[in-house]
Amino acid sequence: MTCPICGSKTAPSYRPFCSKRCADLDLAKWLNGSYAIPASSEDEEEPLDQEAETPVAPRH
């Protein structure tokens, strides 16, 4: 198996990456929005005002 970032052989402790550096680079891509999981319109949540129609029990 090769590292998806640089193509080097993977290290067991960082699998599927070869090093902490490549793992961190991949995490940074997720955090800055370079990677995204597409959503279909069916997956969209209901607007918040519709969810509020359900009564909420008072807190003690």
From Swiss-Prot:
GO biological process, one term: regulation of DNA-templated transcription
Disordered: region residues: 38-60
Matching Pfam families: YacG (PF03884)
Domain of life of the organism encoding this protein: Bacteria
Gene: yacG
Single GO MF annotation: zinc ion binding
Cofactor section: Zn(2+)
Stated role: Inhibits all the catalytic activities of DNA gyrase by preventing its interaction with DNA. Acts by binding directly to the C-terminal domain of GyrB, which probably disrupts DNA binding by the gyrase.
Cofactor note: Binds 1 zinc ion.
UniProt protein name: DNA gyrase inhibitor YacG
Biased composition (Acidic residues): 41-52
Binding residues for Zn(2+): C3, C6, C18, C22
Assembly, per entry: Interacts with GyrB.
Alphabetical UniProt keywords: Metal-binding, Plasmid, Zinc
InterPro entries (alphabetical): DNA_gyrase_inhibitor_YacG, Znf_NHR/GATA
Family membership: Belongs to the DNA gyrase inhibitor YacG family.
Gene3D superfamilies (alphabetical): Erythroid Transcription Factor GATA-1, subunit A (3.30.50.10)
